[in-house]
């Protein structure tokens, strides 16, 4: 089963995705997409690793590409948290330059498909974006458009789409109506 879990900031989407993934298989891989770019990020990563270890997840750090996680596939479940970080890391280089969004989209769609085929189950956490209107910086608007397009492409090919609102999972596609 392949499931996309989306929600706004603080909606509970990650906690729901972790519970879902833990229920699907005893072999659990957690793909972390946050870039380690300083002491604060390093501490957050350390804390998250510790929390996930208690749930039986093996963590694979993939801030720029999902392909490294494909090598560990097979039986079991993979949880990617989250697509927003992955898109930002792929779109914006550390020096601030921006990649071609169309190229980034196609690359990430290909990586998601490869990951979904590498594991028995895949759970991806995406960000619900775009409802806030437009942003002052065009680069932020480009990120919003790209994450929205990626969510749509994943939703079209995955078995299940769940939107988490205030901690409540709402099945949009597949699953329980």
Where are the model-predicted features located?
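Generic detector of well-ordered alpha-helical packing
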Residues: 14, 62, 82-83, 128, ...
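Residues at the starts of beta-strands that form the adenosine-phosphate
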Residues: 26-29, 76, 121, 160
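Residue-level signal for inorganic ion chemistry
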Residues: 17, 48, 79, 127, ...
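Short, glycine/serine-rich, charged loops/turns that create anion-binding
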Residues: 10, 35, 84, 129-130, ...
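Conserved P-loop
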Residues: 2-72
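Structural motif
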Residues: 4, 77-79, 123-125
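Helix-adjacent hinge/juxtasegments
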Residues: 55-104
